[in-house]
A protein has these predicted regions:
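A short beta-loop-alpha structural element at the N-terminal edge
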Residues: 4-18
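Conserved acyl-donor/pantetheine-binding loop and adjacent beta-alpha core of acyl/acetyltransferases
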Residues: 76-131
Length: 202
């Protein structure tokens, strides 16, 4: 289907959140799955739009955002900004856990309040990272490849030489797609179930 890539604008925030809700579980939707539909995008979309909108791009079909790519040029800097500027916003809406996470939603909340877990030593040589999501009708048509190319150029211009992304084990099609684009898996000892893949930015 016809769509074009453009830089993110502030008015795209609800559209990006909608796409995240429709795709936020390894490409499948999470609408109605948690106590609020904002839970997943508040972890996987909002902080990037708020903290580093200069590296955010949307796929626009002329009516709305139907896909996006977001991320950071420096994961350590992003984690510091998340803790200083994004977590206070989250604490106004969500209650930190008082004990170990037990449910799926509690595991999401646990991840939300502990961004420092993203600072893994094996990923240090790959400072940039990204998240990409497209609605089903806009997959397998070159849009994902073009979004990734656009993002890598953006973070390269900001000084990042290499980028990583994470793929859940169940998302076999996504891993196959990334490997076709030249992303290579790396061993990460303390990773949650899934795979990390890396790619130079230029």
């Amino acid at each position: 289907m016809t769509a074009k890539i453009r830089a993110y604008r502030a008015g795209d925030w609800p559209g990006v959140y909608d796409v995240c809700v429709e795709t936020g579980n390894a490409g499948q939707g999470v609408r109605g799955r948690y106590s609020t539909d904002d839970l997943v995008p508040d972890i996987l979309a909002g902080p990037y739009l708020y903290l580093e909108p200069e590296h955010a791009y949307v796929l626009d079909n002329g009516e709305r955002a139907v896909g996006y790519i977001i991320g950071t040029a420096s994961t350590p800097d992003f984690v510091a900004a998340y803790q200083e500027r994004w977590l206070p916003r989250l604490r106004a809406r969500y209650q930190p856990l008082s004990g170990p996470p037990m449910t799926e939603e509690e595991h999401r909340l646990d991840a939300m309040f502990h961004p420092e877990r993203w600072l893994l030593p094996e990923l240090a040589p790959h400072p940039a990272h990204l998240h990409i999501n497209l609605l089903a009708d806009y997959r397998r048509s070159g849009h994902g490849r073009a979004l990734i190319r656009t993002f890598l150029a953006s973070v390269a211009a900001a000084g990042a030489a290499s980028c990583y992304l994470a793929v859940r084990q169940v998302n076999v099609n996504a891993r196959r797609f990334y490997e076709k684009l030249g992303w290579r898996p790396i061993e990460v000892r303390d990773a949650e179930p899934g795979t990390y893949l890396v790619h130079p930015t230029s």
